[in-house]
Amino acid sequence: MKRIGAHVSASGGVSNAPLNAAKIGADAFALFVKNQRQWSAKPLENQEIENFKQNLKISKILPEHILAHDSYLINLGHPNLQNRQKSLETFIDEINRCEILGIRLLNFHPGSHLKLISEQECLKNIAESINKALANTNRVKLVIENTAGQGSNLGYHFDQIAFIIKNVSDKSRIGVCIDTCHAFAGGYDFRTKAAYEKTMSEFDAKIGYKFLSGMHLNDTKNELGIRKDRHESLGKGFLGLESFENIMNDKNIDEIPMILETIDETIWPDEIKILRNLIKGN
């Protein structure tokens, strides 16, 4: 079964996120477990933790269908050791917040070399940071999101993600999230059945469907291979609805959170319905 939702607001407290997801007809959602533009935050209060769990029950969304997103500040591949350590500490804090809330998946952008070190050295830094994070936490799966390759961000090519996974010690706690806008920006096409099958065959060969733990379903304002991150509403960008029809009818993709990050949140309920209607037999 396809589990579809959006990256909903946790404004006023994380406990609001499940209710915000329910309002749009979602059976999955993403959220930030703290302010994504600050390095640190006060600990979660016991009442807020309890409210989150209660509201999750009210929403009827299962914990495994939540894809938390880490802070935009974190750079696990940072060229500077001190800055990389700062990122790692914040990353570990966010993993622990997920653990406390009962969230099983934390999505993150791999990292950036900032044009100060080689791509290979940066990828090694990322893998090393992940290993340290895993060694200092429990249970939560760390989900690598492919990037658009904008600037010096890595993770836009399946080979780069495969290298990171190869160098992670505990592969039971590592996963991948495919962002369709980012993938298209990185040169991966979804628009026809043949193009989709080629892209996903390459993903399976280089990474493996077994690591696919979530998806971000976004159309794009840019053409194929431009390496710019510009989201668009479903069907209004260069990917078009056929791309999403191919995804929604892929039987290899089931029971993972499929998250909208499209630009107009007022139409998320409609976009969720569109995605469900694309499934053949519905």
Curated annotation (Swiss-Prot):
Annotated Zn(2+) 3 binding lies at 182, 229, 231
Q: Which CDD domains match?
A: AP2Ec
According to the UniProt entry, its GO molecular function terms are: deoxyribonuclease IV (phage-T4-induced) activity; DNA binding; DNA-(apurinic or apyrimidinic site) endonuclease activity; phosphoric diester hydrolase activity; zinc ion binding
Pfam family for this entry, one: AP_endonuc_2
Q: Which cofactor does it need?
A: Zn(2+)
Q: What is its EC number?
A: 3.1.21.2
Positions with a binding annotation for Zn(2+) 2: 145, 179, 216, 261
Give the matching PROSITE patterns.
Answer: AP_NUCLEASE_F2_1, AP_NUCLEASE_F2_2, AP_NUCLEASE_F2_4
Q: Which residues form a coiled coil?
A: none
List the InterPro entries: AP_endonuc_2, AP_endonuc_F2_Zn_BS, Xyl_isomerase-like_sf, Xyl_isomerase-like_TIM-brl
Superkingdom field? Bacteria
From the UniProt record, list the reaction(s) this protein catalyses: Endonucleolytic cleavage to 5'-phosphooligonucleotide end-products
The record describes how the cofactor is bound as:
Binds 3 Zn(2+) ions.
For binding Zn(2+) 1, which residues are annotated in this chain's numbering?
A: 69, 109, 145
Q: For this chain's UniProt record, which GO biological process terms are given?
A: base-excision repair
Keywords of the record: DNA damage, DNA repair, Endonuclease, Hydrolase, Metal-binding, Nuclease, Zinc
Q: Which family does it belong to?
A: Belongs to the AP endonuclease 2 family.
Q: What does this protein do?
A: Endonuclease IV plays a role in DNA repair. It cleaves phosphodiester bonds at apurinic or apyrimidinic (AP) sites, generating a 3'-hydroxyl group and a 5'-terminal sugar phosphate.
**Name this polypeptide is given:** Probable endonuclease 4
